[in-house]
Amino acid sequence: METSSISTVEDKPPQHQVFINFRGADLRRRFVSHLVTALKLNNINVFIDDYEDRGQPLDVLLKRIEESKIVLAIFSGNYTESVWCVRELEKIKDCTDEGTLVAIPIFYKLEPSTVRDLKGKFGDRFRSMAKGDERKKKWKEAFNLIPNIMGIIIDKKSVESEKVNEIVKAVKTALTGIPPEGSHNAVVGALGNSNAGTSSGDKKHETFGNEQRLKDLEEKLDRDKYKGTRIIGVVGMPGIGKTTLLKELYKTWQGKFSRHALIDQIRVKSKHLELDRLPQMLLGELSKLNHPHVDNLKDPYSQLHERKVLVVLDDVSKREQIDALREILDWIKEGKEGSRVVIATSDMSLTNGLVDDTYMVQNLNHRDSLQLFHYHAFIDDQANPQKKDFMKLSEGFVHYARGHPLALKVLGGELNKKSMDHWNSKMKKLAQSPSPNIVSVFQVSYDELTTAQKDAFLDIACFRSQDKDYVESLLASSDLGSAEAMSAVKSLTDKFLINTCDGRVEMHDLLYKFSREVDLKASNQDGSRQRRLWLHQHIIKGGIINVLQNKMKAANVRGIFLDLSEVEDETSLDRDHFINMGNLRYLKFYNSHCPQECKTNNKINIPDKLKLPLKEVRCLHWLKFPLETLPNDFNPINLVDLKLPYSEMEQLWEGDKDTPCLRWVDLNHSSKLCSLSGLSKAEKLQRLNLEGCTTLKAFPHDMKKMKMLAFLNLKGCTSLESLPEMNLISLKTLTLSGCSTFKEFPLISDNIETLYLDGTAISQLPMNMEKLQRLVVLNMKDCKMLEEIPGRVGELKALQELILSDCLNLKIFPEIDISFLNILLLDGTAIEVMPQLPSVQYLCLSRNAKISCLPVGISQLSQLKWLDLKYCTSLTSVPEFPPNLQCLDAHGCSSLKTVSKPLARIMPTEQNHSTFIFTNCENLEQAAKEEITSYAQRKCQLLSYARKRYNGGLVSESLFSTCFPGCEVPSWFCHETVGSELEVKLLPHWHDKKLAGIALCAVVSCLDPQDQVSRLSVTCTFKVKDEDKSWVAYTCPVGSWTRHGGGKDKIELDHVFIGYTSCPHTIKCHEEGNSDECNPTEASLKFTVTGGTSENGKYKVLKCGLSLVYAKDKDKNSALETKYDMLIGKSFQETSEGVDGRVKKTKGKYVMPVEKNFQETTEGVDGRVNKKKKTRMDNGRPKKKQRSGRDDNQTRMQVELQEGNINSVIMHTVKNF
């Protein structure tokens, strides 16, 4: 017997450079597919597990991780649902611990802290998945360590194509720093032998990762590429390795120039020397004079004017230093072409208008960081056999340093020759405060800041990872104006004390810890300096909030940030506690463990007559604020951000108060809130979140003054009946979801882009709806009073998504032309005629009891990719579907009898995955089933051709699947058996260059007709035995059914599942290594049925089948050549159904001796027909065969051959054989 294919990995494992760890259901067909393509275009060999239901067995995947050099760990929302992802992550951590793997974490629409600390739904899914698993602790360690590596963040504002390029660049950079396997500089060798890669008698250089840095810098200085004089700036944060890089550059390049000079420590020298000494020092180095004078430069100028010079200036810190050297720099630029000047600084602004290009020194990658740390931690004993015992602790220090070379050097030196107990103790101390030697490095840059910049730096540390606009707004309302705040952020960015990424302000962890240390030192001195309090132990003492030691210290408290999740005991707050805090700007009582901030038990006891005279407060966050209103003495004159979720408030404050700076208000789930009158003067308000304020009935008319309001969330305000007439010109997002008493929607802004009216009581849209020319999303789901959609909706030229699900009384959809409409959801409506919109890509008509047929013109909807017809119980037939349709879901169409012939047009070049689902279509006629199977066969054949032609079958993936009621394996499957297991023997060269994919089939029966499931998946695991008797297992999906939207359903009838997957990667490797060898292969297949993540014992595989699919030979002119694998055995069964479906199948058997020549049939355009044999087995016994006449068939063969129907000719030939 014979089967599909897979190559062995034990014999010749593929040398993958990059392994991608990701959750397939989230990212496979979007982000990851683009990333894989980009990596391959850059000649980077990448491995991914290609199947959603887990393609490879875990041991194979773990082996792939070990064989890889780099891992991309992509954390997405549903990552922790998969135990496979987490076990891969555990392996990744182990390999990085051993120093054999570089991990690059990618946070896909997640915060790194969410992953690291397992917060929110991400953490909830992990705890649910890992419940009761003894490996939970190890997994948590992996989540704690891997996300701490400097990674790449992709949020909602990111342009994914740009992020893909950034990842590819990071991978290429990492690969260049990884020595070839077997070289002396490989990580394993470097960790085991301090002399690896060094010449005899030479001490190994104490830095790592400089080779690629030097190469990148040299590219910017290239004398062949850039003929003129060139000035390059080398920039980066303090301690990042600029000085080391420049010394290496100078050492390498000085021999290329007749005159060269290196002036280092310019920052320090400028403090002890007059600035006019700098040009004298430089000129002296260039001219080789001991005491040159700038006043008399004629001789040095004339001497050097015709020479190419190299000048390296290190640690430039002020504009005055540049100005002092300007005359000489200008002279160099005017001199002979080919000179090079390199200026290193930690202040990017100093290079503006001076340099031709800039090189930014980045953090070290994980591998270089580990090597550098180990070099200094074991500097006198590199061959220490106990080094492996320190590996886990080493990882902790490396993660702490986050690729910062100086920190790695300092920490390694402090731990050299120390015991493991000392290492553990040091790690605990670092959690409290950074090393003084690290602090001193940053202190130099901090001391050079102005007072305003220092305050801005320390304030930003309190709000890192927040939007830049938000941070600048907080700073602008402090001692700085708007322009000054923006200038402060830019200055700190230029000095690399902060950085902006995707619109957010970030700060390196070491700088963040440094900022806290600065505040702590300020408190421990005389108490006269303003400070910010982060640690709860500094805020709460003895069961009371006791920040104050005296009035002077209270007056200098600038911020209080209390994490309520860390408050274990009941704590009392005195009514006069804040009375002396006149300078308090930031007050936050929050919960870091619950992002939605809803589960906290409020352990802070607050008196009713609390005094809150906080005139200077800019940010007020108080989770579950217990009072009905803010105290009367509260003055919001400088308030920018007010967040009081789940509060007991009825109104903000009594009367009107000036709020000229207020921009963000969040009062979500304040269920007693009934008045918003306090916001009547908040004319600069931009975001207002009132979700879940169930008592709120109306908006004040004064809110029409909010001309800057862009976001208004009223979701779940169940008492809200209407909105006042107003024109909020900046409003872009309006959410009224679940406002069940809201009856009439007035047009309150012409600029709305996203409008959510789902679950409201509105019965019609406003008459002037056509004014919403920027509207992109309109959601009216579950508007049960809505009876019609006005034709003027067709005038909304920007509308892309229209959701009308469960609008039970909606019977007619107007004939409109919305040229950009991509998504139309009409499920649960009473519409009788399907609308035809040429641009629609996703159309949902499910749960419609009125539609009995679909329009024939649907085949012309070339953009339609997803058609949902689930539970359309009156639907009796479907017409031909368009060629680009990727998913058809007709589950539960109980009246469906017929389908079009052909079912859908197939484009010869299409490569998209497609799924056609007909589960629980109990009245489907036999002719319809035969057309579905015929379509599946044609689809497999054309897909094999397209994949081979357009990507050479490089990427293995599931390309087509279908399922429908039935009990037989289609006749075009070459191998069939009863039961769930199939054993085959494949002939020599079965894996030749034309093998494109594998077609699989399983007949599944439900043992308990009353059983209900939400998901059903059929997978096939097959093992291939090669000539060395080793087995390789490979798993791929056959087909699946999922009940979307929750709930469960019965699968009562037997169902046929057919799936086609492109050639697996392991087969490709086997093919490349053994294409000329003649090796028979044994294979076995096992089909299983799972519900969710575990095998479902209530479902049984009755029959199964296999066919290998081959693409046409590129040297032939036929449109397609399909060849079938054949069996070495005694049984024979023919295939007699052509591609066009016109030839009916017959079954039978011949019992033939093994020594007979059984040859496969492959028909080309030259008309030559070779013999082919095919076998069908029933429990290992051959079935009986009835022979058919040959004369009519011979005539038909000639006609078919003339018409180019090659596959029909093949089937006839086999039949007559």
From Swiss-Prot:
Enzyme Commission number(s) of this protein: 3.2.2.6
Span list, region Important for interaction with RRS1: 33-34
Outcome recorded upon mutating residue 111 to K: Increased cell death
Domain TIR, residue spans: 14-175
Resulting phenotype, residue 134 to A/K: Increased cell death
GO molecular function: ADP binding; ATP binding; identical protein binding; NAD+ nucleosidase activity, cyclic ADP-ribose generating
Outcome recorded upon mutating residue 34 to A: Loss of TIR domain homodimerization. Loss of TIR domain heterodimerization with RRS1. Loss of cell death induction
PROSITE patterns: TIR
Keywords noted in UniProt: ATP-binding, Cytoplasm, Hydrolase, Leucine-rich repeat, Membrane, NAD, Nucleotide-binding, Nucleus, Plant defense, Repeat
Subcellular compartments: Endomembrane system; Cytoplasm; Nucleus
Pfam families: C-JID, LRR_3, NB-ARC, TIR, WHD_ROQ1
Protein family (similarity comment): Belongs to the disease resistance TIR-NB-LRR family.
Functional description taken from the UniProt entry: Disease resistance (R) protein that specifically recognizes the AvrRps4 type III effector avirulence protein from P.syringae. Resistance proteins guard the plant against pathogens that contain an appropriate avirulence protein via an indirect interaction with this avirulence protein. That triggers a defense system including the hypersensitive response, which restricts the pathogen growth.
Domain statement: The TIR domain is a signaling domain involved in cell death induction. It is involved in homo- and heterodimerization, but other domains also contribute to the interaction. The LRR domain may interact directly with pathogen-derived elicitors.
Descriptive protein name: Disease resistance protein RPS4
Gene giving rise to this polypeptide: RPS4
